[in-house]
Curated annotation (Swiss-Prot):
Family: Belongs to the cytochrome P450 family.
Tissue distribution of the protein: Expressed in liver.
One Gene Ontology term, aspect cellular component: cytoplasm
Gene: CYP2H1
GO terms, molecular function: arachidonate epoxygenase activity; heme binding; iron ion binding; oxidoreductase activity, acting on paired donors, with incorporation or reduction of molecular oxygen, reduced flavin or flavoprotein as one donor, and incorporation of one atom of oxygen
Protein name stated in the entry: Cytochrome P450 2H1
Organism field: Gallus gallus (Chicken)
Chain sites annotated for binding heme: C436
Role, per record: Cytochromes P450 are a group of heme-thiolate monooxygenases. In liver microsomes, this enzyme is involved in an NADPH-dependent electron transport pathway. It oxidizes a variety of structurally unrelated compounds, including steroids, fatty acids, and xenobiotics.
Induction field: By phenobarbital. Significantly increased expression by estrogen. Rapidly up-regulated within 0.5 hour after extrogen exposure with a peak at 1-4 hours. Expression is significantly decreased below control level after 30 hours.
Enzyme class: oxidoreductase
Membrane topology designation: Peripheral membrane protein
């Protein structure tokens, strides 16, 4: 060995030690979840259909099982497919899976701040504050219930003024829902004809429309390339920035008129927290603006879309609408507004609402998670910071829990004796530590708005019911209802 020389021998020894250490590390960590072999830079783009990601994931799960790895471009993602594996991750190992995975489009829109997209101590502090403050302002209590009942009255009267003429109810619904979150966060509702309010809602609706454009769908695969190209994805980003600017103006106005002795709304409560804890870096004007944006967007789009989709489904199924009418008439009558205390006495109506949320499968991919530390799941090793897709669609469409899941059937949530049946598989708001902070508010809004509408009106389609299509328009983030018109006939 003398001919090799001492430096060469030492180098070989070092390389051998490094290889052994790497092997031991890999052996101790275990194997990572399997998946299709990615192509450098572009990942698994050819195995994934951007217009039907759920179909692609279903096929991959048949080959690789309920936990597998894909690559969006160079980004590695672990996909969880099915109730059991999602429960193991988000509930049984909730702390490890409590991170927020950020897709390129979400990062571009929200900058990793606020409640939805932040991580670590920032997320914990902001979420804790938001839940406490919303609860103090009446979330889940009578104060918020009364606000929704009042807004439902405005909505019913606005519908009544259409005089049975057919129209797309989308704007009416989003205006009403948006006003609830505005009253909580901004301190007051807007008039339905307020120009700033209408412009704001118009941008949100435009963003919904642009979600299924090819440029938007491909942004998560190739963000750097798409950033340099024109297209609707640029409008989507610009609209979000405009909404952000609108909220900043409101925040500034609140700061100028702030009175610590009389907090008016969520923004005032946040400003008060900033004043009390000036050394706390988690409570800043930027985090206030982003958290307010999160509450506004999340508190408007999901609920209004669920209501809009629900009315379309009822147009398709008049027999279901008629049963709801009879139950609401028997329990609530016509002389008072529906209230949350009625829900336990309206099992069929409650079942229909749950089935609407299950059937529409609004966020099939869920909002991405991430592991906050090296983690093992079913003997697979998942490195820290790996993005996780805990899919909701396979849970809400599980044929063992919900027979014939492709069929709209309130019986999925009814016992044989007609009482309401709860299901652990009902996860439209996700599960675990990252469950939607506004779940309680959304449930209340959907119930009170829908029952108020059906208490006062029957739904009349403008075309033959057999031609009504209740399949979704699939976008990059959500399932959306197809455009439709309806006549509201006073009862």
């Amino acid at each position: 060995m003398d001919f090799l020389g001492l430096p060469t021998i030492l180098l070989l020894v070092c390389i051998s030690c490094l290889l052994i250490a790497a092997w031991r590390s890999t052996s101790q960590r275990g194997k990572e979840p399997p998946g299709p072999t990615p192509i450098p830079i572009i990942g698994n783009v050819f195995q994934l259909n951007p217009w039907d990601l759920m179909g692609s994931f279903k096929e991959l799960s048949k080959k690789y099982g309920p936990i597998f790895t894909i690559h969006l471009g160079p980004k590695k993602i672990v996909v969880l497919y099915g109730y059991d594996i999602v429960k193991e991750a988000l509930i049984d190992n909730g702390e490890a899976f409590s991170g927020r995975g950020i897709l390129p489009l979400i990062e571009k829109l929200f900058k990793g701040t606020g409640i939805v997209t932040s991580n670590g101590e920032t997320w914990r502090q902001l979420r804790r504050f938001a839940l406490t403050t919303l609860r103090d302002f009446g979330m889940g209590k009578k104060g918020i219930e009364e606000r929704i009942q009042e807004e439902a009255h405005f909505l019913v009267e606005r519908i009544r003024k259409t005089h049975e003429e057919p129209f797309n109810p989308g704007k009416f619904l989003i205006h009403a829902v948006a006003n609830i979150i505005c009253s909580i966060v901004f301190g007051d509702r807007f008039d339905y004809e307020d120009k700033k309010f209408l412009d704001l809602i118009e941008m949100l609706e435009e963003n919904n429309k642009y979600q299924n454009r090819i440029q938007t769908l491909l942004y998560n695969f190739f963000p750097t390339i798409l950033d340099s190209l024109p297209g609707p994805h640029k409008t989507l980003i610009k609209n979000t920035e405009t909404v952000d600017d609108f909220i900043k103006e409101i925040v500034i106005a609140h700061q100028e008129s702030f009175d610590a002795s009389c907090p008016r709304d969520f923004i005032d409560a946040f400003i008060n927290k900033m004043e009390q804890e000036k050394e706390n870096s988690y409570f800043t004007v930027e985090s206030l603006t982003r958290t307010t944006l999160d509450l506004f967007l999340a508190g408007t789009g999901t609920t209004s879309t669920t209501l809009r989709y629900g009315l379309l489904i009822l147009l398709k199924h008049p027999e279901i609408e008629e049963k709801m009418h009879k139950e609401i008439d028997r329990v609530v009558g016509r002389d008072r507004s529906p209230c949350m205390a009625d829900r336990s006495q309206l099992p069929y109506t409650d079942a229909v609402i749950h089935e609407i949320q299950r059937f529409i499968d609004f966020l099939p991919l869920n909002v991405p998670h991430a592991v906050i530390k090296d983690t093992k799941l079913r003997d697979y090793f998942i490195p820290k910071d790996t993005m996780i897709f805990p899919l909701l669609s396979p849970i809400l469409q599980d044929c063992k829990e919900f027979p014939n899941p492709e069929k709209f059937d309130p019986g999925h949530f009814l016992n044989a004796n007609g009482t309401f049946r709860r299901s652990d598989y009902f996860m439209p708001f996700s599960a675990g530590k990252r469950i939607c902070a506004g779940e309680g508010l959304a449930r209340m809004e959907i119930f009170l708005f829908l029952t108020s509408i059906l208490q006062n009106f029957s739904l009349k389609p403008v075309k033959d019911r057999k031609d009504i299509d209740i399949s979704p328009i699939i976008t990059s983030l959500a399932n959306m209802p197809r455009p439709y018109e309806v006549s509201f006939i006073p009862r």
